[in-house]
């Protein structure tokens, strides 16, 4: 469940995995655990660590303590890391949206820049009066799928309210 804490035995397993198979296997173990638990923001952090390790970087971003300047990363490695982080954003954002956590999911999907994938994920969520404003905000004002948002507004709010929405 989302509120469950990580047990001490999990930390022991993590330590054993790190010693036996290395930090990448441990990072993958954390990602798998967070994915299975539906803890998507934590999954994103685990995927960041995993991808940094895959690219030969420290698990977390480091800064030179004496200068306060971030440790340099080559352009090639940075580009590869950025691509992996976009894929992590896609996975986490899609999962959150499908859970009905539209705003949380959009925070990740905005970085992906794939309106179609966002719209597709949103189609898995039941539209209610409680989430209609969020749907319309993302579909119309954020430009995820203006056509669907307009059709949705027309069917649920009528012509006058839709015109007002489109004018704002």
Where are the regions a protein language model picked out?
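Long, low-complexity, acidic Ser/Pro- and Gly-enriched intrinsically disordered regions
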Residues: 1-110, 116-168
């Amino acid at each position: 469940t989302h509120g469950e804490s990580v047990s001490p035995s999990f930390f022991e397993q993590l330590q054993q995995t790190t010693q036996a198979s290395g930090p990448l296997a441990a990072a993958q173990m954390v990602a798998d655990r967070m994915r299975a638990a539906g803890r998507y923001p934590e999954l994103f952090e685990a995927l960041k660590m995993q991808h940094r390790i895959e690219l030969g970087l420290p698990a977390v971003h480091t800064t030179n303590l004496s200068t306060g300047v971030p440790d340099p990363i080559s352009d090639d490695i940075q580009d590869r890391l950025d691509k992996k982080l976009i894929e992590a954003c896609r996975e986490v954002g899609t999962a959150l949206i499908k859970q009905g956590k539209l705003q949380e999911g959009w925070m990740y999907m905005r970085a992906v820049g794939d309106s179609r994938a966002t719209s597709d994920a949103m189609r898995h969520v039941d539209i209610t009066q409680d989430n209609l404003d969020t749907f319309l905000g993302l579909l119309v004002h954020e430009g995820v799928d203006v056509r669907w948002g307009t059709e949705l507004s027309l069917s649920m709010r009528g012509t006058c309210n839709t015109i007002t929405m489109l004018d704002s």
